[in-house]
Each structure stands twice: as C-alpha cells, then as structure tokens.
Swiss-Prot record:
Keywords: Isomerase, Magnesium, Metal-binding, Phosphoprotein. InterPro entries: A-D-PHexomutase_a/b/a-I, A-D-PHexomutase_a/b/a-I/II/III, A-D-PHexomutase_a/b/a-II, A-D-PHexomutase_a/b/a-III, A-D-PHexomutase_C, A-D-PHexomutase_C_sf, A-D-PHexomutase_CS, Alpha-D-phosphohexomutase_SF. One of its GO terms (cellular component) is cytosol. Mg(2+) binds at residues 106, 247, 249, 251. It catalyses: alpha-D-glucosamine 1-phosphate = D-glucosamine 6-phosphate. The active site is at 106 (phosphoserine intermediate). Binds 1 Mg(2+) ion per subunit. Signal peptide: none annotated. The gene is glmM. The modification Phosphoserine is found at residue 106. CDD domains: GlmM. This is Phosphoglucosamine mutase. Its cofactor is Mg(2+).
Length: 458
C-alpha cells in the first residue's frame, strides 16, 4: 500500500493559521529535521542554517520548534530575530550558510504564519527540494540522529539588523544622500519596523513613521502595502515628497507620489526598467513581469524599447524566468521587485532606494516619473472562498467568464485565479472604460461568491 504524501508547500512556502495544520509546533520540528536531512543528503557533514522571523506572536514558538528540529540533527542555527525576508536571503549568503529560513506569512493577517526556505545562494528552494522535504516529513525518514556530543548549537546574530541596514544603504550611490526629502513610511508593524526607518534616516531623509509599533497581533492590520490609503492621507497631511508602504515581511512595496496617488509595482518596475536601460545596464533590454501587469504599462515599456517577458503570478515564477532569460530586473503589480544585481528575492527597502535615486538624479518628482505611463482601466476584486474548487468545473462561473469576454471583445481581458497563499479568488478585468470593467468584475465576483464564497473583501 502506497503511503500518501501530503502537500505542505504552496506558492510561497508553507503557510496557514498558527496552531492549525500545517502550521503547528509539531510540524515545524519535523520541517527542521527535514531541512537538515536534505542538507545531509546533498553534502554530508556539518551545516549552518540562518533563521529569521517577522513580528507575529506565533513566531516565537515556530522559531524554537524549527531550531529544535535542526539542532537535533546536528545543524548549527544562526538566529536573527525580526528581520525582513530579503535580510534572511542576504545574511544566508554573507555567512556562507547552507540554508536560510524565514518565519512569516508575509501580507497575511497576524493569525497566520508561514515558513519560507532559501538555498545557500539566497534563492527560494526548488520544487524538487520541496517535494523531498514533504516526503521526509510524511515518512519521518530524516536520516540517522547524531550522537549526543554532535547535536547542533544555537547562536544569536546580535548585529543582524545592522548588517542588513548597511547592505541596503550600499545599493544607494556613495556620495549621494536623501537630504531634503520628506518620506512617509509605513512598515505594517512588521519585520522592517526597525531597519527601514534606520536606512532612510541614515541616508539623511526626514522620515515620518507609521506601522512601526508591533504588538505581535497588529501586523498588516489596516496598514502596510495592502492598505496604502494610510500613506495616501499622510503624504497630503505632511506635505511629503513620497510615501512608502511595505508588507509584513518587507519583500514588497507600494509607493505614493507627492499628490497622494498610488504608484504600484507595475509603475515602479517601469520607472526602474527605463532608468537601467538608459544607463545601459538592463540585461538584454528585457524585464520579467506577470499576467497581472497592466496593458498600458506593457505598451509604455514597448514604446521605450524594453522587451517584457510574462510569467505566472508569484515572485518565484518571476525569478525563475529572470534566471532562465538572464534578466536582472523583474516584478509584480503587487509590489514584489527583484533587482538581481543586489539581492536574490523581492526587497521593498532596496526597491524604494532605487526609485528615490532616480528621483534625485533626474531632479524629478515621483509624479513626473510616472506621467508618461498611461494605465488601462483595471478592476481587481478579491472573493474569500471556503475551498479552492477548480474553476473550470463551475458552470455558472464559466458562463459568466464567456459573457464578460464577449462583452470586452478584443479591447480587454479577464483573469480569474486563486491566490497561492490564501483562500481567495481574484477577479481581474481590464478594458477601455473604467465603469465597464468595474461592472463586469463585480458580475463575476458576485457569481464566484454565490458558488464558493464567504464574502467579497473590500
């Protein structure tokens, strides 16, 4: 009889509600053992693993559980404490560690948590390695336990934040500062709550902080990259030059210009791509974007001579395409920006610094930089669902999709997909007229909600 291997990994690691399967202490111990087992399979001997986390209350128990699993298998753990996900990727490389683990559910509510695993090079592990970890966990076959004298040690890296701060600052040109810029910064009460203000302040910006007082249960709570209205209002109130909103683990960014208008990942990607092309350092004059990228943005990129490779949604898919096609810039509308010249994963702070550098070098406001980009009207509605039933098996949903596509003709498009990290169905409609796409998106969302949902998320 074949034993079933239960999938643990989604599109961005293991994720779920804390103290519910799969995010339990028991599972975390097993995952720690499995990571150790994979490392031993790849290269027998002593190994070191970096462990970081965001500010969720449950991070403490998962941190200890992972360390227990790892050290029981002879792994030395280097504990960073609260630090952005890109900080874990950076320090994994800097310490020549064999792997890195980030305990975070990214933009999800505080009651969720997750585990992201990085290779020694700072890249998220491959599907093959994920399947091997799942196999080890399912069969509890991790290899031989070491003798009592060979279990691993646990060390705290006391200057982890400082190291990442200096790394981030080093991506900004020497001799330049942010002097004269007033920045509204929202850290979502998350992993970047200390490092992000320090980076911008040490570069001599005036920083007005929001979302920098984590309690363990307020991460992403009506703040951060998913709720840019906070910094929209604050930028106007404080007459700031720019607003920067990060998510709970600091790997994505949404910006706001001096007029209080949102500058999303599509716009940030376009600004940075055009700048790198002008400097002659955009590899192959190509970037990687996703199926969610606005058509107007794609048209702008085409007009300035930049080829855009389209990947599925998810920073892992973006990165895979970047590596395959040797691109050094890629990103998503949601705010994941990957600058491979600097880091191996999305990095909100580094992305912000690149936009600020362009503003300073060109003596432009953020609204000046985005003014040539005319986005197509687009509507995005999120529907919370009870379970992710294959959408192509739902006749009413498929009928609605056919009707909407017929209404749009060749002048628009519709995308319907499940989130890879939450029980959410995303409805995206793009077309020529705002009122039309809003109406059509709501039509589909209402039908999805009636078939599967527990409510439309405002």
């Amino acid at each position: 009889m074949t034993r079933e291997i239960k999938p643990l990994f989604g599109t961005d690691g293991v994720r779920g509600r804390a103290n519910h399967e799969p995010m339990t202490v028991e599972m975390s111990v097993l995952l720690g053992k499995a990571v150790a087992g994979v490392l031993q399979e790849c290269k027998p001997g002593r190994h070191r693993v970096v462990v970081g986390k965001d500010t969720r209350l449950s991070g403490y128990m998962f941190e200890n559980a992972l360390i227990a699993g790892l050290t029981s298998m002879g792994i030395e753990t280097l504990v960073l404490g609260p630090i952005p996900t890109p900080g874990v990727a950076f320090i994994t490389r800097a310490y020549r560690a064999d792997a890195g683990i980030m305990i975070s559910a990214s933009h999800n509510p505080y009651w969720d948590n997750g585990i992201k695993i990085f290779s020694s090079e700072g890249f998220k592990i491959s599907d093959v390695i994920e399947r091997r970890i799942e196999q080890m966990v399912a069969f509890k076959e991790f290899g031989n336990l070491p003798e009592d004298y060979a279990v691993g040690k646990n060390k705290r890296v006391v200057d982890a934040m400082g190291r990442y701060i200096e790394f981030a600052k080093a991506t900004f040109p020497r001799g330049r500062t942010l002097n004269g810029l007033k920045i509204v910064l929202d850290c979502a009460h998350g992993a970047a709550y200390k490092v992000a203000p320090s980076v911008f302040e040490e570069l001599d910006a005036e920083v007005i902080c929001y979302g920098c007082e984590p309690t363990g249960s307020n991460i992403n709570d009506n703040c951060g990259a998913l709720f840019p209205s906070v910094i929209q209002k604050a930028v106007i109130e404080h007459k700031a030059d720019v607003g920067i909103a990060l998510d709970g683990d600091g790997d994505r960014i949404i910006m706001v210009n001096e007029k209080g208008h949102i500058v999303d990942g599509d716009m940030i990607l376009s600004i940075c791509a055009n700048d790198l092309k002008k400097k002659g350092i955009l590899h192959g004059n190509r970037i990687v974007a996703t199926v969610m990228t606005n058509f107007g943005v794609l048209k702008y990129l085409e007009n300035v001579g930049i080829d855009t490779l389209i990947s599925p949604v998810g920073d892992r898919h973006v990165l895979q395409n970047m590596l395959e096609y040797e691109a050094n810039l890629g990103g998503e509308q949601s705010g994941h920006m990957i600058f491979l010249d600097y880091n191996t994963t999305g990095d909100g702070i580094v992305s912000a610094l690149q936009v600020l550098r362009i503003m300073i070098e060109s003596e432009s406001t953020l609204s000046d930089l985005t003014s040539p980009i005319v986005k197509s009207p687009q509507a995005l509605i999120n529907v919370a669902v009870k379970e992710k039933i294959p959408l192509d098996t739902l006749p009413l949903v498929q009928e609605a999709l056919r009707d909407v596509r017929s209404s749009l003709g060749d002048s628009g498009r519709v995308l319907l997909r499940y989130s890879g990290t939450e029980n959410i169905c995303r409805v995206m409609v793009e077309g020529l007229k705002k009122h039309q796409v809003d109406s059509l998106a709501k039509t589909i969302a209402d039908i999805v909600d009636s078939e599967l949902g527990v409510g439309i998320i405002e």
